[in-house]
From Swiss-Prot:
The active site is at C186. Catalyzes oxygen-dependent 5-hydroxyuridine (ho5U) modification at position 34 in tRNAs. The lineage of its organism: Bacteria, Pseudomonadati, Pseudomonadota, Betaproteobacteria, Burkholderiales. It comes from Burkholderia vietnamiensis (strain G4 / LMG 22486) (Burkholderia cepacia (strain R1808)). One of its GO terms (molecular function) is oxidoreductase activity, acting on paired donors, with incorporation or reduction of molecular oxygen. Disulfide bonds: none annotated. It catalyses: uridine(34) in tRNA + AH2 + O2 = 5-hydroxyuridine(34) in tRNA + A + H2O. SMART domains: RHOD. Keywords: Oxidoreductase, tRNA processing. SUPFAM superfamilies: Rhodanese/Cell cycle control phosphatase. This is tRNA uridine(34) hydroxylase. It comes from the Bacteria. The keyword Oxidoreductase applies.
């Protein structure tokens, strides 16, 4: 059976999430969906999967059910397909933020930084500069272990362990960005949306966010100017530029990503350990 995988987020003020949670959970279970939906006062972030009829019904539910008062009427979804269900269960969780940055003054609902679509970005990278002749720098806003699976060529990567560290590292390294067109990016767009706003607020000029993130870029232009795969937070582990699951796996012991190359190491024992485990043990 073909499984449809949907990802979406939307920054919008929500004040009834406690009442919504059991109703949304019940609807997902009724449709046989699995995945995770985060609800917070600042919006919604979701990753769900199921048969086509079920995902279509859920999209219609979010966009049109009177319960949501039109809050999700314009919610846009990114879609990919898989041969099996990548999630084990269905969770609807309440959070303070749909992506934790610990900068409560940043409210994307009140205004976004400019965005650049995939085709325009590819044209800039092909030329080596934007439409005004400024050099383009790609800024990866993801965690270090995600970057190691794949990223844009020559992207800036500050090796953060969690997104809440992003403001601090940008404040310390803003000289890297001066005089350039900065394009922040992440998996699906949610982190780079907050990241771009922060950079604008601290006075960095010519900042853009990649519309729809890496996955939308793959969908529209493939893997141009990108090397490796894209880590995803489900049991597929990583998607290639054709949006197909790869042979990468997640280590059962330490949760590190184990690429096909790393699986050739004698330190890789399926279900038990991996090269990252061995490295951590040696450093202990």
């Amino acid at each position: 059976m073909t499984i449809v995988n949907l990802a979406a987020y939307h920054f919008v003020s929500l004040d009834a999430i406690e009442q919504w949670r059991p109703l949304v959970t019940a609807r997902c279970n009724e449709l046989g969906l699995r995945g995770t939906i985060l609800l917070a006062p600042e919006g919604i972030n979701l990753f769900i999967a199921g048969p086509r009829e079920a995902t279509d019904a859920f999209v219609d539910y979010l966009r049109h059910d009177p319960l949501f008062e039109g809050k999700f009427a314009t919610l846009q979804f990114k879609e990919s397909l898989s041969d099996s269900q990548p999630f084990r269960r269905m969770l609807v969780r309440l959070k303070r933020e749909i992506i934790t940055m610990k900068k409560p003054a940043i409210k994307p609902e009140l205004g976004r930084a400019p965005s650049v679509d995939a085709r325009t970005l590819k044209a800039w990278l092909d030329r080596g500069h934007d439409d005004d002749g400024r050099p383009v720098v790609m800024l990866d806003t993801r965690n270090a272990f995600e970057v190691d699976v794949g990223t844009f060529d020559d992207a800036l990567d500050y090796r953060i362990d969690k997104f809440s560290q992003f403001p601090e590292v940008i404040d310390a390294n803003r000289a890297d960005l001066e005089g350039k067109t900065v394009v922040s990016f992440c998996t699906g767009g949610i982190r780079c949306e907050k990241a771009a706003i922060h950079m604008k607020e601290i006075g960095i000029d010519h900042v853009y966010q990649l519309e729809g993130g890496i996955l939308k870029y793959f969908e529209e232009v493939g893997g141009a100017h990108y090397h490796g795969d894209c880590f995803v937070f489900d049991y597929r582990t990583a998607l290639n530029p054709q949006l197909q699951p790869t042979e990468s796996v997640t280590c059962f012991a330490c949760r590190a990503v184990v690429t096909p190359q790393a699986q050739q190491s004698p330190d890789y024992v399926p279900g038990k350990s991996c090269p990252a485990c061995a490295q951590a043990a040696a450093a202990a």
